[in-house]
Swiss-Prot record:
Family that this chain belongs to: Belongs to the YqgF nuclease family.
Species, as recorded: Ralstonia nicotianae (strain ATCC BAA-1114 / GMI1000)
EC number: 3.1.-.-
Function: Could be a nuclease involved in processing of the 5'-end of pre-16S rRNA.
GO process annotations (BP): rRNA 5'-end processing
GO molecular function: nuclease activity
Superkingdom of origin organism: Bacteria
Protein name: Putative pre-16S rRNA nuclease
Phylogenetic lineage: Bacteria, Pseudomonadati, Pseudomonadota, Betaproteobacteria, Burkholderiales
Assigned keywords, A-Z: Cytoplasm, Hydrolase, Nuclease, Ribosome biogenesis
Amino acid sequence: MPEPARPAPAPVPVHGTLLAFDYGEKRIGVALGNSITRSARALEVIPNRSVEYRFTQITRLVNAWQPVGFVVGMPVHPEGEDQPMIKLAKRFGNQLHGRYGLPVTWVDERYSSIAAQDAGATDDVLDAEAARIILQQFFDESHA
């Protein structure tokens, strides 16, 4: 079966809240940011127990924060090759787009977890801190 197409990158809305995700098979880090202030903060870690549980928790966050879009980290190998997790992250991003109808933007996250560890993030918040780094990178690099 062919792999679902990646959602087309969408421009950052002029203003609004964005949710960012560091997708993992066991945990999903979530960060919150604002395109006006261009700042991000770690929000929480969602245990990736099942599709139903995952999206119940994400729906709770979408309802609470009313984002205008999502940023999803794409796990790319340091030499630019696809990591095995990239298919799962793509599927997750496609599911976000399909369920909520919001634009999904992809960010190279190859060093986000290492940067979170280097910043002193503890295991219980490591994935949320990695999501914060992904979102801050999104603000800093490509969307002036």
